[in-house]
Amino acid sequence: MKTSINYLPEQKRDDLRRIVECVLEVLPDCEMIILYGSYARNTYVDYDQRIEYGIRTCFMSDYDILVVTNTRFQRYIINHILSKATDNYYKGKNRYASTTVQFIDESIDDLNKAIDKNRYFYTDIKREGIMLYNSGRYKLARRRKLNYREIKELAEEYYNDRFERANDFLRNAMYDKNDERYKICSFHLHQACEN
């Protein structure tokens, strides 16, 4: 995994160092902090504003951060802890003009199981991500070649999860169409296709 963020502008590097500090302040058993997504791939959008169909839109990439801990936390506990880190990061900043931070968290055991099972989201993070902090107490698993049965199980699991969600969005789109709520209908159709 990469470790350098030197290709980023100084302000972005400072932001990422501050994010690491803020996480470590509130989460002492943090094992790794990994930048993934557009900033890790250097495909980020700092700020894009345009007018589409007469509507002004703007877009900024956010910092996607994976926080790895040595224990599995209850969802509400880790969300509360990471929201404190987010609040600390924004102190003294214009929250609406700053690059936003999106945290996800995993225990080291769950992350290594996901990498071992070739779960694409996590293997992409390992391949493209940048290690911002590493306690050195754990190592990330290596991808292994799955046998046919494992590939089939993984594909069925992805399909069942995605297909159910896509059907939920499609159902909502049909209700929206019947109620002549076409904007939200188009959104739900888009979500159905994306899943």
Model regions and ranges:
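Hydrophobic alpha-helical packing segments in soluble, helical-rich domains
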Residues: 185-195
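Metal-dependent nucleotidyltransferase catalytic core
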Residues: 2-26, 46, 53-115
